[in-house]
Amino acid sequence: EAFYRKWLSDLAADQYPDGHVDHVIPAILENQKSSAAWGDAACVCPWELYLAFGDENILRSQFNSMKKWVGYITSSTTTKNLWTGGEHYGDWLGLDAPSGSYKGSSDEDLIASAFYAHSTELVMKAGNVLGEDVSEYETLYKNIVAAFQETWPVYHTQTECILAAHFHLAKDCQAAADQLAKLVTDAGVQLKTGFVGTPYLLHVLSDYGYVSLAWSLLLRENYPSWLYPITKGATTIWEHWDGIMENGDFWTRDMN
């Protein structure tokens, strides 16, 4: 808890006046850009700490930073009530990435808009805990959800399904979860998710009636899986699903 409190204080201190959050905190690199999911740590991390420890002070100390981040998105987007036009990492290292790309094939604007909604909702929740007036964010959140549903009525990748269901953005979240289960099954009970979709994958499957499928993914040892790195002697989390490849080769040093 103490580590993350300190890190979040660094994030707030390094946050730009317009709410921009660099993708490395402390901000030791030059010419950084904000990216959906990365910058959303300004809202996600305080809320997760609050859920873990129940201490309102973490929300109180980060509340202005949380609001500034949502304000940054609102002021920088090219489409009202969505987050479009930015440059993002997308579903980084998703296994459905086009040839020659590190970004998974999920729609980057969909990912960004999903996290816009999520961070706005977290500001609402934090404000309610703190007794703050969050009516502005309640209206914004409703508008984002409506725009999201109009713009993306169907989902084509595992990560798109995951975000639509987990953040309750789809008109029919069960249908989005059903599509996710089909995509996983059709892939040979394999995940294709990257940085964005992976943390929520098993939650969505479990929450929407696919517990057995979630267990099959979790306990899988062949690449790609959570246990595959352990079979190769890993003691930390790799950036790539195959930091050591099946033939024993390593990724280049810029990645691991």
Model-inferred region functions:
Residues 1-256:
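Active-site core of glycosidic bond-cleaving carbohydrate-active enzymes
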